[in-house]
């Protein structure tokens, strides 16, 4: 049984990581941005971050995803892992001025890595973040089985 303080500490860390992500994104964006949209695809040992910054005139600014946001999201994924559900496969962090954000987590759908990552990466990810067989999406099960592994 977990202690109430442990849950509170986890919630506090969750909030801190989301704030760190937002602060890093705002710090990397040019002045007069209208929306910041970060897509994070994370598997054990592999990460891909795509950042879109829309300016007030609706143009797009070329901005590299900041390392601080990437590090916070990698830690957030570890923190959010639950054995009964697994770890999320991708997340989308959308930020609007002055600092209002929403985050969406994908636990089921193929994050469509480009280029595709090897099945061995997903096998490693499932070994690090196991989930019950019924929580392994069909696309992921097929991919891991085709590579000769077991998805659960």
Q: What do the predicted segments below correspond to?
A:
Residues 1-24, 63-78, 120, 125:
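Short, flexible domain-boundary/linker segments around small modular repeats
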Residues 1-53:
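N-terminal "first-domain core" detector
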Residues 69-117, 121:
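Amphipathic protein-protein interaction modules
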Residues 100-152:
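Acidic, proline/glycine-rich low-complexity IDRs
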Residues 31, 40-68, 104-114:
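Extended intrinsically disordered, low-complexity coil regions enriched in Ser, Thr, Gly, Ala
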Residues 28, 32, 36, 83, ...:
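Short secondary-structure junctions and interdomain/linker hinges
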């Amino acid at each position: 049984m977990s202690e109430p303080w442990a849950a509170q500490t986890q919630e506090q860390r969750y909030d801190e990581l989301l704030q760190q992500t937002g602060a890093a994104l705002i710090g990397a964006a040019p002045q007069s941005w209208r929306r910041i949209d970060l897509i994070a695809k994370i598997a054990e040992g592999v990460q891909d971050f795509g950042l879109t910054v829309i300016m007030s005139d609706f143009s797009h600014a070329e901005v590299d995803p900041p390392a601080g946001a990437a590090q916070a999201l990698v830690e957030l994924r570890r923190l959010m892992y639950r054995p009964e559900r697994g770890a999320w496969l991708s997340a989308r962090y959308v930020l609007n001025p002055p600092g209002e954000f929403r985050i969406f987590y994908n636990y089921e759908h193929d994050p469509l890595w480009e280029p595709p990552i090897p099945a061995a990466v997903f096998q490693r990810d499932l070994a690090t973040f196991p989930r019950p067989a019924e929580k392994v999406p069909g696309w992921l099960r097929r991919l891991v089985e085709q590579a000769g592994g077991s998805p659960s």
